[in-house]
């Protein structure tokens, strides 16, 4: 029984190591949309999902629809928005929202900010070898501004 459980865990770990995944650890819906695909024939199949609370979406790094570079270390730009009132956009550098970059086999976690801050949500990005790319504070998700307002 323990061997079967261990084998299942190894299988799960191996499969997620070959994909980038976006985890929504918030209590709100989150939209994740890949930037325009360089191959217009694949653009309609790019990653474009709305994730419910506590859910995830993954893309195997060799799938060219959602990882145009096709490698574990390819960089993919994603638009990350948190739905609700007020809406939030996540990105770095400040003012570049909603742009978040992930490697082809990395992970993005959208979660409540564990620190006391004006920004209630942050994004954590890790590479395939679990290196944290976002520093101790993470990437802040700021309140979205309506077009035409300052």
For the regions a protein language model found, what residue spans apply to each?
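Sec-dependent N-terminal signal peptides
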Residues: 2-13
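Intrinsically disordered, low-complexity segments enriched in small/polar residues
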Residues: 15-150
